[in-house]
Amino acid sequence: MAMEAARFERTLRTESSEIFTVYGGARRLGRVDVHYGRFEVHGTLILDVELTDDELQQLIDQLDEELVQTHDPEREDFLVTVFKGEELGFYS
């Protein structure tokens, strides 16, 4: 069964990177940091929830289509590192 399409809420943008909170419906799924290099794009995806391999691939494909390709359609590769963790707090 396919996972509901994710929603991405940008929390930060610089000249070469962006940070998005990832939601599935009203539930927070995690966060993704996207860094735009000259020829490739690197993503660090930190999940708050368990996803199946198929759901994870679906999410990565959606990240690529909605965030990466719209920013740089000519890039050669989107490289993603995935972590599973929990947010302990936000400090300033």
State where each predicted segment sits.
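Terminal leader/tail segments of proteins
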Residues: M1-G24, R28-S92
